[in-house]
Amino acid sequence: MGSTSSLYAAIDLGSNSFHMLVVREVAGSIQTLTRIKRKVRLAAGLNSENALSNEAMERGWQCLRLFAERLQDIPPSQIRVVATATLRLAVNAGDFIAKAQEILGCPVQVISGEEEARLIYQGVAHTTGGADQRLVVDIGGASTELVTGTGAQTTSLFSLSMGCVTWLERYFADRNLGQENFDAAEKAAREVLRPVADELRYHGWKVCVGASGTVQALQEIMMAQGMDERITLEKLQQLKQRAIHCGRLEELEIDGLTLERALVFPSGLAILIAIFTELNIQCMTLAGGALREGLVYGMLHLAVEQDIRSRTLRNIQRRFMIDIDQAQRVAKVAANFFDQVEKEWHLEAISRDLLISACQLHEIGLSVDFKQAPQHAAYLVRNLDLPGFTPAQKKLLATLLLNQTNPVDLSSLHQQNAVPPRVAEQLCRLLRLAIIFASRRRDDLVPEMTLQANHELLTLTLPQGWLTQHPLGKEIIAQESQWQSYVHWPLEVH
């Protein structure tokens, strides 16, 4: 068993889907080996007396037989299986669980709504970057969890009896996507939310994070349609109108919405609109992890780091043997440039963080080959698991690294949606200049420079005589000015 002792598994018997996550512990963080998800729709098998139908239980057991095969290689002490809302509710849950334990060969724990909310929050805290004070929303099949917290500590936990499967059965049973069905679903959701809204608002939040299939589906729709990844009430209302326009559930077609998610999408959307309205949420982003990640990190007893992005960057630098001193050097020059033009260009703090992150990884492509290093870097960053970074932020980092040198591919900077295209162009310019001026790989050879921005014109002032004393540097900067001019980025160097 020794060789497999670094493997851990978390299984979540949800009301809509059963999920299994298998990971390996590597140097204080986790590497995902397997993710299996099966739509079981257990909640749909509850009758008016809250008894699970034999068909629903059989669907669940069939799924667990698949999971059991994978669990044979993992020590039982490193497996956690939890059941949530539907099995909390079902009067015959004992029958289902007895057979489930027999199939899996390990205990199945029915957790309370509050414990579910706590675990979801831990999963988010371990995997999601951004501000420390957060509101986490998870819309499940039969329950919705709402949690506020700061860092690793929760400040309020609520598990509410509404979910995308139960709301589907209750308000969209006729499969009609009319305004009246949405109104009824939203009104009911707001009534469920009202008793807890004041306490959630009292604790407050700086960022709101969504950790469910509904939010994942929204993210996929927005990425497919070229929008930025921030979920707003305006976007939710637009999608609702699109759904109403489709008329019926079986005719629901939205760019980016998969067939698998379509069935419970309208009910999840109605609940999310109610949450946004009742709590006056301005904007929400997708979490990096939730319940299963919370279970895994709980088994590993790993502390929540203050800055998840920094941990991720450190791990990647070690793994790909990136020259950390050089990465820091480039980051320092880039930060200096950013601070000098920040006001004129109206740049936000998150843009600075993403620029510094790009600097930390800019030489990752060398681990493949010097030839086409920027392309290798972009490929690696696009495809690596980067906890703390959203999918859109990963795409921006990859795009910046692709354009760190050589002629600029303007279209790629416009295809990312983490920041506006103009901001992506500006960050790219700063990264390219920082790499040039730190290229001698010594702190004492980085010149004192001032960088001024006047609209899109950048004026770089070097120490007197520097260009004369550094003929190669002069040639590289002349080439860079030319490349930037090709894409209408004026650069003057004195």
UniProtKB/Swiss-Prot annotation:
What EC number(s) does its UniProt record assign?
A: 3.6.1.40
Quote the catalytic activity from the record: guanosine 3'-diphosphate 5'-triphosphate + H2O = guanosine 3',5'-bis(diphosphate) + phosphate + H(+)
Pfam families to which the protein is assigned, alphabetical: Ppx-GppA, Ppx-GppA_III
**This protein's record includes keyword Hydrolase:** yes
Annotated GO biological process: guanosine pentaphosphate catabolic process; guanosine tetraphosphate biosynthetic process; nucleobase-containing small molecule interconversion
Q: Which residues form the signal peptide?
A: none
The protein's matches in SUPFAM superfamilies, at most eight in alphabetical order, are given as:
Actin-like ATPase domain, HD-domain/PDEase-like
Q: Identify the Gene3D superfamilies for this entry.
A: 3.30.420.40, Exopolyphosphatase. Domain 2, Hypothetical protein af1432
Keyword list, A-Z: Hydrolase
Q: Which GO terms describe its molecular function?
A: guanosine-5'-triphosphate,3'-diphosphate diphosphatase activity
**What pathway is this protein said to act in by its record?**
Purine metabolism; ppGpp biosynthesis; ppGpp from GTP: step 2/2
Task: Give the family this protein belongs to, as stated in its UniProt record.
Answer: Belongs to the GppA/Ppx family. GppA subfamily.
Give the protein's function: Catalyzes the conversion of pppGpp to ppGpp. Guanosine pentaphosphate (pppGpp) is a cytoplasmic signaling molecule which together with ppGpp controls the 'stringent response', an adaptive process that allows bacteria to respond to amino acid starvation, resulting in the coordinated regulation of numerous cellular activities.
Q: What is this protein called?
A: Guanosine-5'-triphosphate,3'-diphosphate pyrophosphatase
Report the gene name.
gppA
